[in-house]
Regions:
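A beta-strand edge to alpha-helix "cap/lid" segment located at domain peripheries
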Residues: 2, 53, 57-121
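A solvent-exposed, acidic/Ser-Thr-rich amphipathic alpha-helical stretch
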Residues: 5, 20, 24-77
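Solvent-exposed, amphipathic alpha-helical segments
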Residues: 6-13
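Alpha-helix initiation/capping motif
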Residues: 12, 41-45, 94
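Hydrophobic side-chain positions on well-ordered alpha-helices
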Residues: 13-14, 73
Length: 121
């Protein structure tokens, strides 16, 4: 699969709410996942598929998602960008918010070698 194919499929899965399935399908074993902030007070950088999976499990356990909009993908070479807008409630605060996030994905051998997330205000 080329970058466009991977990007299109990842977006399709995310639009269906299948974020964990998208990760399992496309993360490289040594994927590096970088958040703008440290999730749950942990490290903002997760290294390896198990760590990325754990970060996702923590996120799902600590947030209630009411709806998701997914835009993209926007492809350039071995990279692509996807924008996510999530209507969600962090369980700790109980305050419903809209999170605006952009993911930059870099592929190597058809797998996500790095994902880097940026947040809007």
């Amino acid at each position: 699969m080329n970058t466009q194919d991977v990007a299109n499929d990842l977006v399709t899965l995310c639009k269906q709410g299948k974020f964990a399935e998208a990760g399992e399908k496309y993360w490289a074993d040594d994927v590096v996942s970088v958040e703008a902030g440290a999730p749950g007070g942990g490290d903002p950088v997760s290294r390896g598929k198990d760590a990325a999976r754990g970060k996702g499990e923590w996120w799902e356990a600590n947030h209630e998602v009411h709806g998701v909009e997914v835009e993209g993908p926007y492809v350039n070479g071995d990279q692509f960008v996807v924008r996510f807008k999530m209507d969600m409630t962090p369980k700790q605060s109980g305050q419903r918010v809209t999170m605006d996030e952009t993911g930059l994905y870099t592929l190597k051998n058809g797998k996500i070698a790095e994902e880097r997330f940026f947040y809007g205000g």
